[in-house]
Curated annotation (Swiss-Prot):
Protein name: Terminase, large subunit
Stretches the record annotates as ATPase activity: 1-282
Organism: Enterobacteria phage LP7 (Bacteriophage LP7)
Quaternary state and interactors: Interacts with the terminase small subunit; the active complex is composed of dimer of terminase large subunits and a nonamer ring of terminase small subunits. Interacts with the portal protein; this interaction allows the packaging of viral DNA.
Source organism phylogeny: Viruses, Duplodnaviria, Heunggongvirae, Uroviricota, Caudoviricetes
Annotated positions binding Mg(2+): 317, 455
Length: 475
């Protein structure tokens, strides 16, 4: 071995010194495991969100990853010295972007879970190690920089975790993290803190109480969950009606880059059939019925170049506070098969900005649009349809309807679902915004379609409705 060869050339004293250094290095690595963490693309999106949003949610399918990501953010929210700032930038490969904010002051934060057990066996274990075993380190802090106070009731439960650091390497400070279970509302209350993190599908009242603790410092909070047990009111609030300051990131098993495709399919197949969508993609159980109860694999396909004989139409759904969406639909008229080939979706973008984003594939392609394109107030002055036409879009003369003049949402969704079931509606696997909506589209307790987070689906429906009135547009 290489080490043996090196040791053979050293004196006894040098060998002892080298072995001590190697042992010290190994101990350091064991107590700084988080520094070596390299995020996957979806994890990085979650980390990035802390720069632009006050509240961000990681909606996952594996609990270990969710807790690790939550603690990643918690661990590097606490300290702020120069060494830590360099480490976090290196760790997430973002030195050039400047998107990671690291405080240079003494901070306090809170981490909550459903019960004492979920706190000790998830977030606390990952950050601090197994307290009951003493010798197993956590992924976050070196022991020499940290201290803690145990609960007098449950000895393996920490109530306060303290981390010492330096401001500008001169002034020594102590940032602290409170661990709490939140089974009862009162346990979420407490002192004013800088940041708050929650795991699992907690009631929204618990989340709101934790958020209140951070009002003074800007309401920074994070939430991670796997929606296996369905939609709690907190999950519902984030997934269906997020505010401008809230960001939701959905990470599926297909975003776990350490698994091969074969391993992913093997893992999914090992779960009971009724749990697979929740386990694999984080799709919550809809109490009143998910509309597209169709496996994604049956409609996904690899991208390909558009053949000359395909008919092509674009379509859009207007939006400002909620996202606007632009899609491109291809129709193989001979086989009567439709392909959703391109998708773009974004909030608070003008017609000119939207055109700049999709011009490369939307130029001179007819665009189907909904009836609210006749409105003036959203853009102030000209009709929305006119604004988009002036920006460069080839807007069809009339808003989207079926050939008989109707525009029923139910009819459109029913026809698209039938096409999917018959294998005649395919979606390029690059169109992730479509699948994010597809997974959650459902009916309320009265059986009506819930019209939120459906921008891409609406645009797709408009394109399908107007497929016969596109003036034979082809590439």
């Amino acid at each position: 071995m290489e080490l043996d060869a090196i040791l053979d050339n050293l004196s006894d004293e040098e060998q002892i010194e080298l072995l001590e250094l190697l042992e010290e290095e190994e101990n350091y690595r064991n107590t700084h495991l988080l520094y070596e963490f390299t995020p996957y693309s979806k994890q990085r999106e979650f980390i990035d969100a802390g720069h632009d949003y006050q509240s961000d949610v990681l909606w996952l399918v594996t609990s270990l990853v969710s807790h690790l990501l939550a603690l990643l953010k918690s661990r590097f929210t606490l300290p702020g010295d120069t060494r830590e700032r360099k480490v976090i930038r290196l760790m997430v490969n973002m030195a050039e972007s400047g998107k990671v904010s690291v405080s240079m002051s003494q901070l306090s934060s809170g981490i909550g879970g459903e019960t004492n057990e979920t706190v000790t066996k998830t977030t606390q274990r990952i950050l601090c190690g197994r307290i009951e075993e003493n010798d197993e380190p956590g992924y976050g802090s070196p022991k020499e920089d940290s201290s803690w106070e145990k609960s007098s009731v449950l000895l393996i439960l920490l109530i306060i975790f303290s981390l010492s650091h330096h401001r500008l390497m001169v002034l020594k400070m102590h940032s602290i993290c409170y661990f709490k279970h939140t089974r009862r509302h009162r346990h979420a209350a407490g002192d004013t803190i800088t940041a708050y993190g929650l795991t699992k599908r907690l009631p929204y009242s618990i989340y709101a109480e934790g958020l209140t603790r951070t009002n003074k410092y800007g309401q920074f909070s994070i939430l991670t969950f796997t929606p296996l047990m369905g939609m709690s009111d907190g999950v519902t609030k984030f997934l269906k009606n997020p505010s401008k300051s809230q960001k939701v990131v959905n990470m599926t098993i297909y975003d776990a880059e350490h698994y091969t495709d074969e391993q992913k399919e093997q893992i999914i197949a090992s779960y009971p059939e009724h749990e697979r969508e929740a386990r694999a993609r984080g799709i919550p159980t809809m109490g009143s019925g998910r509309i597209f109860q169709i496996p994604e694999e049956t409609i996904k396909c690899q991208p390909f170049e558009c053949p000359d004989h395909f008919y092509v139409i674009d379509a859009q759904d207007f939006g400002w506070n909620h996202p606007q969406a632009h899609i491109q639909l291809w129709w193989d008229k001979d086989a009567d098969v439709f392909y959703l080939a391109r998708v773009w979706k974004k909030s608070e973008n003008t017609a000119v900005q939207a055109w700049g984003a999709v011009k490369s594939w939307a130029n001179k392609i007819p665009v189907a649009w909904p009836h609210d394109g006749h409105q003036h107030e959203k853009g102030g002055g000209e009709q929305l349809k006119t604004q988009y036409a002036d920006a460069g879009f080839s807007m069809l003369p009339d808003h989207a309807t079926f050939p008989d003049g109707g525009n029923s949402v139910e009819s459109g969704i029913s026809e698209l679902r039938d096409l999917m079931l018959e294998g005649r509606f395919k979606v390029f696997n690059t169109c992730e915004p479509f699948f994010e909506e597809f997974r959650l589209y459902h009916r309320d307790e009265n059986g009506k379609i819930v019209k939120t987070n459906d921008d891409v689906l609406d645009a797709t429906r408009y394109g399908y409705m107007m497929r016969l009135r596109q003036d034979d547009a082809r590439y």
